[in-house]
Amino acid sequence: LHKEYRRQRQMCIRDSAKSDDKHLQERGHNKAYCCYYHAPVLVIVSNKPTQWWAGMDCACAIENMFLAAHSLGIGSCWINQLGTTCNDPEVREFITSLGVPADHQVYGCVALGYADPKAPLKEKVVKEGTVTIVE
């Protein structure tokens, strides 16, 4: 890729464990809600929406973060909320103060932390017919 396009993707890393900012800790009037599941680190991945591949570029970066985190024994989770709310004036002001460029669209966030070993794991059931093998 041309170096100009490679430089467009931006990652803003927030140490949310040290944050007392209510924007990250609460949403609306539900005090129990936490959009990043109380993870100690939140990575906000954004890009200029001027190219059709901007979202895919961010998705690839996020997936690579998931793979790297897993290799280090760190849990990860894709967070979508900022992708749909980043252009709300209050949210935009807040994420710009964190370092997200004003002309960027947020395509996803990554919550990183160590999994709670006591938390029950949900068994994933793959529905029949959702995978097709073409020979």
Residue spans for each PLM region:
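Single conserved hydrophobic/aromatic residue that forms the stacking wall/gate
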Residues: 1-13
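Short secondary-structure boundary/capping segments
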Residues: 3, 33-35, 98
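Short, charged beta->alpha transition segments
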Residues: 11, 26-36
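Short acidic (Asp/Glu) patches
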Residues: 19-30, 90-94
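Helix-biased detector of long, well-ordered alpha-helical tracts
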Residues: 27-31, 44-52, 131
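Short, surface-exposed beta-edge/turn micro-motifs
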Residues: 39-42, 106-107
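Small-aliphatic-rich amphipathic alpha-helix that forms the alpha element of a beta-alpha
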Residues: 43, 48-94
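C-terminal helix-cap and adjacent tail motif
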Residues: 100-135
